[in-house]
């Protein structure tokens, strides 16, 4: 059966940890008939949290995809859902999911409001221009305040909130919502897991508030819709429900507004209305219309329209290792269709790959399908060479889509196999795990020869080591966590490197003149500009020179830390018709970079974390003093509805190892903290080198 893309939705559910993402997804699966029993996070039965570590810890670690159908307005909508982690250590899962999704449901706790990871997820959605709706969850909890959370979304996230519902009751008395558009009350039946609800007239005590927010709603959408504006000023009664719904959808897709609704997923209230809102307001693939890419042959921009008649194109956004089927590549199809058993082109590698099997995923279960079409999300096996961010396409119509960018790891750990006989098994495990997770990096320390694994936080690496033991049967000894510093250039230098070697017979010769300078602010990697003229360096050697410079950036001139932002202008050079070859120019580039970098007054960069502490007022002084002693900079202090203090600060990661234990001591166990990576900043002198020689 062919897709009707008008009725397809590709959405993600994202939020801070413990806001109720997985609980919400489990309710969606129940109400749409995928599951016949509600899975719960707290008892380890959630379908989407299928990893043993997720079930044991009660948190989501990896993004999980599924598919369901929902009847809305007499049409069956197909909804592809990706449930994402809320812990900052696993933000890579959110990043790569949002890259391929058309819409997002952002969950907020009605008690805790906008939390640190809420802000991170919001920035990621802004980066990829993902339309979203907000769902204020946990309306049944003590301290729930729907309107306060809406204000936080406005002030902290800069969102133009459009309130579509008013809660009926609060905390233990939360019963349902008033739909502002239809001016009806929706009350859920608690006896049958919320599968049925009643439509009633609005309670009299909420009529005035409903009219107030309905006027605000119409005024807001009229700012972006001239038809609504005209009716609003001439005769507001002419504005129909369909007019309002259509206008809200248009403004949501244009990122002008964020519709806000509310409920309690755990108490089975509000989820069906959220599914209606997904169908009503979030875009279908044809609402997005097209995706732009680059033709690798012509290097010109090309467009793929989102329909099955276009040439096939897709983006691989996740690689996973499955014990039964092997390497599994998740991908979003933007155009055309793919049949199992056919060949496609990997634009990065230039290789043709045969797709042996295609699956629709339901958490960790694979449902085989023969064909997958534009607008769908699926997975496939058969790839010999596949990486996250690869574009897959019809070999006759090559295209490269924008890749997925990931944050750099900030924490490292030295490991070795517990038993020498396991060294090969450890290497295999590390290779497969780093293939899955672009923020998990494996390297050998050039000073000590140790294997260093790097990731986004202590929990991230803890999960990696746990998976090595469970899935690959490898036990390791580990050192203490260490900060992943970086090096940076501060000055420009023009440098000439001549590599010459004579050993009798054919020798080696390469001559390059280049300018090395700091990269543009906010950029990553190497910006390479070739200005060589007149064939002084044969053009076939230029790619090798660029590749060698990139390789050289992995080892900075001070202590061997990576330089991740530089600009190189290749100015001139010379070659020998007999002695010059690709290797000669690669060696000249690597040696030249190292020699030039030493003269740019390089500095050390350290990772800075955004720290947020929630504490009783009486412990605030001790905690602020301790943060100051850790080279922290206080960014602000707030008070929440329970009169607890929220301390926000920027603190170097090197000062935060073991901070949870320290905080517990300072507050007698009453304070809690969260942290997330902020940015790399110059480390002030003196720089103490730990575990370096």
From Swiss-Prot:
Domain tr-type G: from-to ranges: 6-286
Chain's gene name: fusA
Record's keyword terms, sorted: Cytoplasm, Elongation factor, GTP-binding, Nucleotide-binding, Protein biosynthesis
Top-rank lineage group of the source organism: Bacteria
PROSITE patterns cross-referenced by the UniProt entry: G_TR_1, G_TR_2
GO cellular component, one term: cytoplasm
Gene Ontology biological process terms, A to Z: ribosome disassembly
UniProt record similarity statement: Belongs to the TRAFAC class translation factor GTPase superfamily. Classic translation factor GTPase family. EF-G/EF-2 subfamily.
Record-level Gene Ontology MF annotations: GTP binding; GTPase activity; translation elongation factor activity
PANTHER family, A to Z: RIBOSOME-RELEASING FACTOR 2, MITOCHONDRIAL (PTHR43261:SF1), TRANSLATION ELONGATION FACTOR G-RELATED (PTHR43261)
Protein name according to UniProt: Elongation factor G
Function: Catalyzes the GTP-dependent ribosomal translocation step during translation elongation. During this step, the ribosome changes from the pre-translocational (PRE) to the post-translocational (POST) state as the newly formed A-site-bound peptidyl-tRNA and P-site-bound deacylated tRNA move to the P and E sites, respectively. Catalyzes the coordinated movement of the two tRNA molecules, the mRNA and conformational changes in the ribosome.
Organismal lineage: Bacteria, Pseudomonadati, Bacteroidota, Flavobacteriia, Flavobacteriales
Residues the record lists as binding GTP: 15-22, 83-87, 137-140
Compartmental location: Cytoplasm
């Amino acid at each position: 059966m062919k897709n009707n893309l008008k009725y397809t939705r590709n959405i993600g559910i994202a939020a801070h940890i413990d806001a109720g993402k997985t609980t919400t997804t489990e309710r969606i699966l129940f109400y749409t008939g995928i599951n016949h029993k509600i899975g719960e996070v707290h008892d380890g039965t959630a379908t989407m949290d299928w990893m043993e570590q997720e079930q044991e810890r009660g948190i989501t670690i990896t993004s999980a995809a599924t598919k369901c159908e929902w009847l809305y307005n007499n049409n069956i909508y197909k909804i592809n859902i990706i449930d994402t982690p809320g812990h900052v250590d696993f933000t890579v899962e959110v990043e790569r999911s949002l890259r391929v999704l058309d819409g997002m449901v952002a969950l907020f706790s009605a008690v805790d409001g906008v939390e640190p990871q809420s802000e991170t997820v919001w920035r990621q959605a802004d980066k990829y221009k993902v339309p979203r709706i907000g769902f204020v969850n946990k309306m049944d909890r003590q301290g729930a305040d729907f309107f306060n959370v809406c204000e936080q979304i406005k002030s902290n996230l800069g969102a133009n909130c459009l309130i579509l519902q008013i809660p009926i009751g609060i905390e233990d008395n939360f019963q349902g919502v008033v739909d502002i558009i239809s001016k009806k009350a929706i009350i859920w039946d608690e006896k049958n897991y919320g599968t049925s609800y009643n439509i009633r007239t609005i309670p009299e005590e909420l009529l005035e508030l409903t009219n107030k927010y309905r006027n605000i709603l119409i005024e807001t959408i009229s700012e972006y819709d001239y038809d609504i504006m005209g009716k609003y000023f001439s005769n507001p009664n002419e504005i129909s429900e369909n007019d309002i719904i259509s206008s809200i959808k248009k403004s949501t897709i244009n990122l002008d507004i964020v519709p806000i609704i509310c409920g309690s997923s755990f108490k089975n209230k509000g989820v069906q209305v959220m599914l209606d809102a997904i169908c009503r307001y979030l875009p279908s693939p044809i609402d997005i219309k097209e995706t732009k890419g680059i033709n690798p042959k012509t290097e010109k921009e090309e467009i793929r329209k989102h329909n099955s008649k276009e040439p096939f194109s897709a983006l691989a956004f996740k690689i996973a290792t499955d014990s039964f089927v092997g390497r599994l590549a998740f991908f979003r199809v933007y155009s055309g269709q793919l049949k199992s058993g056919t060949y496609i082109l990997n634009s990065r590698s230039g290789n043709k790959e045969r797709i042996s099997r295609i699956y629709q995923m339901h958490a960790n279960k694979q449902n085989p399908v023969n064909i997958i079409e534009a607008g769908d999300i699926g997975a496939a096996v058969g790839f010999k060479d596949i990486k996250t961010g690869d574009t897959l396409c019809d070999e006759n119509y090559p295209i490269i889509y924008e890749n997925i960018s990931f944050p750099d790891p900030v924490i490292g750990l030295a490991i070795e196999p517990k038993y020498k006989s396991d060294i090969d098994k450890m290497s295999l495990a590390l290779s497969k795990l780093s293939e899955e997770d672009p923020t998990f990096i494996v390297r050998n320390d050039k000073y000590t020869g140790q294997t260093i694994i790097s990731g986004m936080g202590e929990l991230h690496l803890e999960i990696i080591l746990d998976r090595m033991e469970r899935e690959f049967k490898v036990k390791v000894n580990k050192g203490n966590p260490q900060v992943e510093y970086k090096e940076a250039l501060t000055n420009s230098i023009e440098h000439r490197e001549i590599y010459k070697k004579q050993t009798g017979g054919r020798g080696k010769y390469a001559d390059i003149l280049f300018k090395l300078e700091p990269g543009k602010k906010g950029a990553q990697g190497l910006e390479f500009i070739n200005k060589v003229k007149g064939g002084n360096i044969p053009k076939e050697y230029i790619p090798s020179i660029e590749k060698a410079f990139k390789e050289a950036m992995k080892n900075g001139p001070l202590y061997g830390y990576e330089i991740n932002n530089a600009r190189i202008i290749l100015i001139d050079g010379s070659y020998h018709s007999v002695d010059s070859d690709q290797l000669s120019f690669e060696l000249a580039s690597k040696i030249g970079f190292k020699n030039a970098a030493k003269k740019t007054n390089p500095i050390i960069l350290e990772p800075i974390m955004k720290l947020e502490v929630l504490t009783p007022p009486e412990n605030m002084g001790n905690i602020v003093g301790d943060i100051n002693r850790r080279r922290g900079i206080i960014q602000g202090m707030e008070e929440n509805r329970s009169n607890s203090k929220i301390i926000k600060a920027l603190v170097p990661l090197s000062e935060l190892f073991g901070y949870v234990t320290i905080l517990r001591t300072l507050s007698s166990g009453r304070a809690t903290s969260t942290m997330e990576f902020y940015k790399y900043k110059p480390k002030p002198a003196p720089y103490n080198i730990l575990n370096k020689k």
